[in-house]
């Protein structure tokens, strides 16, 4: 089955002039980022259909010839970039006509509503006006209103392409107790600078490593009883982050599942204690993380710290934080670190975890990575 992206024309594919009529070549301007976004959607299997209201098209005030030239040029430019439209549907009525073919009416959609090859669950409508969203509602499909100064809206073309083509794996977790208030938001399919605010600057710096080197958008906000100590804030942040990972991954279909180095990359410098994991050096320090999104939480830590604290973070809570992630996410994590500088050792642990996560959450198809039928 094929998903269809129904798109408005003026204000959506091309910018809309002040007189609302694109009846001259010099008025033709493309909306920002529309072509790369539509190419991404094309590659994701979408077909495109233009659905546009053109008030009084064919009348003396809006001759058909004035419309056809710029419209044909627009279609030629799209085609030259690899974007073809399945059909261009134009309603030429006036608003006062209340024609059933005029958006938000769906009179022009009858052949599509009868087409059983369309994947309606994935189909969507993009437009700049509220009537486009009402049109989508009448078709029972998702509607995206492009952000414009005149009509509002909250979407841009890159965001729409990400939403529809990537099927982003997102989660927002709010964990509230008498001791802490933790909010974790992540998007495993979008790269963005990490944002962290826990009241513990060193801990924030470590959390940033997870998003940065994990290759996903991460936003963590925490308010805790730091007047007592750091334990509850660090522990509950780990639990909330683990829960967010579990929710974002869903049934884990299509993921790599495991995060570790191949057999060709042994951790040779550790001597007899060598293990296989994602190996990461940091000056004199080397850390290894191997993980499995098995659904069975387990944590093994091999390492020691000489200092009691690093900044505002007790080193005894470093393994406890990782254990909390495992408990809430169902991850099996083996983490090993060797070195002299405790700052390097802790940071290497966070970075090694992040790189192992990056490998494990990577999409590699659609199959469930287990013979059990569930993870």
From Swiss-Prot:
Q: What is its EC number?
A: 3.1.3.15, 4.2.1.19
Specify the pathway: Amino-acid biosynthesis; L-histidine biosynthesis; L-histidine from 5-phospho-alpha-D-ribose 1-diphosphate: step 6/9; Amino-acid biosynthesis; L-histidine biosynthesis; L-histidine from 5-phospho-alpha-D-ribose 1-diphosphate: step 8/9
Region Imidazoleglycerol-phosphate dehydratase: list its residue ranges: 169-375
Which superkingdom is the protein from? Bacteria
Region of interest (Histidinol-phosphatase), ranges: 1-168
Q: Where in the cell is it found?
A: Cytoplasm
Entry's Gene Ontology cellular component terms = cytoplasm
Q: Where are the transmembrane segments?
A: none
Co-factor(s) = Mg(2+)
The GO annotation for biological process reads: L-histidine biosynthetic process
Entry annotation: catalytic residues: 8 (nucleophile), 10 (proton donor)
Q: What UniProt keywords are attached to this protein's entry?
A: Amino-acid biosynthesis, Cytoplasm, Histidine biosynthesis, Hydrolase, Lyase, Magnesium, Metal-binding, Multifunctional enzyme
Show the InterPro entries listed in the entry. HAD-like_sf, HAD-SF_hydro_IIIA, HAD_sf, His_synth_bifunc_HisB, HisB_N, Histidinol-phos, IGPD_sf, ImidazoleglycerolP_deHydtase
Which reactions does this protein catalyse?
D-erythro-1-(imidazol-4-yl)glycerol 3-phosphate = 3-(imidazol-4-yl)-2-oxopropyl phosphate + H2O; L-histidinol phosphate + H2O = L-histidinol + phosphate
Q: Which family does it belong to?
A: In the N-terminal section; belongs to the histidinol-phosphatase family. In the C-terminal section; belongs to the imidazoleglycerol-phosphate dehydratase family.
Q: What is this protein called?
A: Histidine biosynthesis bifunctional protein HisB
């Amino acid at each position: 089955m094929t998903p269809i992206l129904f798109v408005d024309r003026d204000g959506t594919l091309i910018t809309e002039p002040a007189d609302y009529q694109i009846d001259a070549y010099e008025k033709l301007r493309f909306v920002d980022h529309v072509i790369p976004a539509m190419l991404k959607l094309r590659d994701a299997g979408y077909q495109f259909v233009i659905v546009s209201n053109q008030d009084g098209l064919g009348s003396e005030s809006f001759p058909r010839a004035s419309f056809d030239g710029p419209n044909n040029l627009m279609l030629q430019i799209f085609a030259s970039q690899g974007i073809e439209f399945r059909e261009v549907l134009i309603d030429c009525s006036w608003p006062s006509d209340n024609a059933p073919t005029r958006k938000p009416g769906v009179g022009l959609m009858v052949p599509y509503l009868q087409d059983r090859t369309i994947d309606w669950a994935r189909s969507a409508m993009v437009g700049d006006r509220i009537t486009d969203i009402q049109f989508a509602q009448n078709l029972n499909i998702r509607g995206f209103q492009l952000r414009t100064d005149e009509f509002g809206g909250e979407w841009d073309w890159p965001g729409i392409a990400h939403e529809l083509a990537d099927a982003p794996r997102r989660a927002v977790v709010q964990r509230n107790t008498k001791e802490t208030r933790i909010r974790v938001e992540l998007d495993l399919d979008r790269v963005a600078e990490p944002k962290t605010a826990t009241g513990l600057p060193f801990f924030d710096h470590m959390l940033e490593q997870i998003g940065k080197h994990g290759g996903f958008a991460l936003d963590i906000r925490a308010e805790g009883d730091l007047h007592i100590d750091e334990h509850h804030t660090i522990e509950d942040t780990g639990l909330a982050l683990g829960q967010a990972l579990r929710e974002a991954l869903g049934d884990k279909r299509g993921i790599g599942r495991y995060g570790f180095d191949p057999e060709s990359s042994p951790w040779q410098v550790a001597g007899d204690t060598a293990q296989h994991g994602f190996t990461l050096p940091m000056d004199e320090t080397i850390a290894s993380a191997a993980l499995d999104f098995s659904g069975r939480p387990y944590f093994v830590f091999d390492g020691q710290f000489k200092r009691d604290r690093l900044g505002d973070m007790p080193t005894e809570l470093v393994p406890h934080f990782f254990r909390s992630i495992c408990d809430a996410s169902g991850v099996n994590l083996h983490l090993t670190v060797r070195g002299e500088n405790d700052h390097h050792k802790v940071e290497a642990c966070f970075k090694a975890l992040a790189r192992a996560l990056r490998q494990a959450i990577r999409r590699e198809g659609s199959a469930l990575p287990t013979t059990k039928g569930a993870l």
